A protein has these predicted regions:
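Short, charge-rich amphipathic alpha-helices with coiled-coil/heptad character
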Residues: 1-27
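Short acidic DE-rich linear segments
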Residues: 2-5, 123-131
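Short, glycine/alanine-rich amphipathic alpha-helical segment
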Residues: 56-94
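Short A/G/S/P-biased low-complexity tracts
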Residues: 8, 15, 120-126
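Generic structural signal of hydrophobic/aromatic residues within well-ordered alpha-helices
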Residues: 8, 47, 114-117
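Extended alpha-helical coiled-coil "stalk/arm" regions
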Residues: 29-70
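Long amphipathic alpha-helical coiled-coil segments
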Residues: 30-42, 81-120
């Protein structure tokens, strides 16, 4: 039984470092995903600017209303391979971040549970020694 307590105590001491390492991974992935999001925004802005600048032979804007511009944007964005790749990368990064947050939550729960168990058994041990 003492071996289990020692293992739990060791695990309890390791968990803060493990949690900290995962938090740093989240920070790095968040920064990387922000860079990807900025690239996405830049490409989308360029597509919108290009659409706004399209004119016919008479110099009249081809996409004169918001609905037409939005439809053209969706079509152009769907055809832009770089944009599609960046969006796929961004979605993957966001998934990784979510999974890391779940991992932190699990480790935090483990930490609370181990602490509670050790406190419970320590208190019971003290009470049994009083008799």
């Amino acid at each position: 039984m003492n071996l289990k307590f020692t293992e739990m105590a060791d695990r309890l001491m390791e968990l803060p470092q493990a949690i900290s390492e995962i938090q740093l991974e989240i920070l790095e992935r968040t920064e990387a995903s922000k860079e990807v999001q900025d690239k996405i925004t830049t490409i989308e802005s360029k597509i919108k600017t290009d659409i706004n600048n399209v004119v016919d032979a008479n110099g009249k804007k081809v996409y004169s209303n918001a609905e037409a511009r939005e439809a053209a944007f969706i079509e152009d964005a769907n055809e832009n391979e770089e944009l599609k790749d960046l969006k796929t990368d961004y979605d993957y990064m966001q998934r990784e971040i979510s999974e890391k947050r779940i991992e932190i939550e699990k480790l935090s729960n483990d930490q609370r549970n181990i602490r509670s168990l050790l406190n419970f058994f320590a208190n019971n041990s003290e009470n049994s020694n009083q008799f």
